[in-house]
Amino acid sequence: MYIIRKAVEYFKPKINRAYMNEALKKLTEKEKKIFLEMSDYDKFHSLEVYKKIKKTELKNNEKYSKLALLHDCGKENVSIITRVLHKLGFKTQLRNHAQRSFEKLEKVDEEVAILAKNHHNRDYSQEMDAFQECDDES
């Protein structure tokens, strides 16, 4: 069921424009540009993570709100086939997306860039554990 849901979200992401505009108010102009360059699926996913963050102890943490929106900016526009292969454990270009996210963000907000680089690292911090739970559920 998970794979079917993800496929539907990939091909037909239902982005709530009003909610997206609300979330974008958290970002600087440079951060907005990075967010808006993401694929529709990654924007949808990031907004879902952002929505979940707002229901946790991270809800007032500006850096983690930004991380929710920008953590996957390094994925760029990869195909669904690459995404499925990655989920199945094959080495794909997605394995380096956290580093590419860091590189895109480091001159914009170094702290968010460092968080993006580490958003898959377990035991990084309690805050990151809470973030990862939201990311994994989205």
Regions found by a protein language model. Name each.
Residues 1-33:
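Non-catalytic interface/linker regions that flank or bridge core catalytic/transmembrane domains
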Residues 32-45, 51-138:
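Divalent metal-dependent catalytic cores for phosphoryl transfer on phosphate-bearing substrates
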